[in-house]
Amino acid sequence: MDYNRMNSFLEYPLCNRGPSAYSAHSAPTSFPPSSAQAVDSYASEGRYGGGLSSPAFQQNSGYPAQQPPSTLGVPFPSSAPSGYAPAACSPSYGPSQYYPLGQSEGDGGYFHPSSYGAQLGGLSDGYGAGGAGPGPYPPQHPPYGNEQTASFAPAYADLLSEDKETPCPSEPNTPTARTFDWMKVKRNPPKTAKVSEPGLGSPSGLRTNFTTRQLTELEKEFHFNKYLSRARRVEIAATLELNETQVKIWFQNRRMKQKKREREEGRVPPAPPGCPKEAAGDASDQSTCTSPEASPSSVTS
């Protein structure tokens, strides 16, 4: 067997940049030293370990560097697009970015790290120092101070001046409503009745406190009619939410008060002999005092 012929077949010169193919019986001792810097070929591809190169593989050694997959005869897909460097990872950068190569140094995009180191160094101004440089982030606005609040002072002063405007002048004195005679009657303020304990005293001793509305309506009715009929008395009691007895007693007291005032003023004519003190109308009221108390609902029904 011709061993020299077989050795000449196996000894093909292989280097990092030479387009050659490996053989199944290739010996590592036949490779010449590579002229390129020894780096980790898998880290440069960006497919293993996120593109991070190990310091142990970046040191020069006596062994030749491994050939990139692009130097093999078998087509191998690359993770980075053609003409761009693989993604480089750094603590001060965000997502993976591709940077164009200065020049093609290999058949499959295999390049020296120094070809894009200068390009990456120019981007440190926009991303370093927490956004202090001329980066894509706008500078922070200063907090509001006296300068900003002073610009709003005129607007606030105008609003305050509108609120403090003098109220509208009062309208000229309009003529008051017509005052009737029954509205000029002097009334004493109602006195609060003391409620007795149950079983002590009679309920008739309680005094009814009329409201202003009720007194006004009763005075108005007394001005026109000093004596009420039974039907009119029931109607007024239902309107003012009173009972018939309360309306009857109020009219009796009101007639007595009216006669007392007339006597004090000397306008009461002397009573003729043989005439009772009360008029015929009063007699009719006295006759109905003994009648049972009728409620408005029973009368109207």
From Swiss-Prot:
Keyword NADP among record annotations: no
Annotation: DNA-binding region: 203-262
GO molecular function: DNA binding; DNA-binding transcription activator activity, RNA polymerase II-specific; DNA-binding transcription factor activity, RNA polymerase II-specific; protein domain specific binding; RNA polymerase II cis-regulatory region sequence-specific DNA binding; RNA polymerase II transcription regulatory region sequence-specific DNA binding; sequence-specific double-stranded DNA binding
Keyword annotations of the record: Developmental protein, Disease variant, DNA-binding, Homeobox, Nucleus, Transcription, Transcription regulation
Domain of life the protein comes from: Eukaryota
SMART domains: HOX
GO cellular component, one term: chromatin
GO term, biological process aspect, one: pattern specification process
Main subcellular location of this protein, as a coarse class: nucleus
Region (Disordered): 20-77, 127-149, 254-301
Residue pairs linked by disulfide bridges in the UniProt entry: none
Disease listed for this protein: Facial paresis, hereditary congenital, 3: A form of facial paresis, a disease characterized by isolated dysfunction of the facial nerve (CN VII). HCFP3 patients are affected by bilateral facial palsy, facial muscle weakness of muscles innervated by CN VII, hearing loss, and strabismus.
Protein name: Homeobox protein Hox-B1
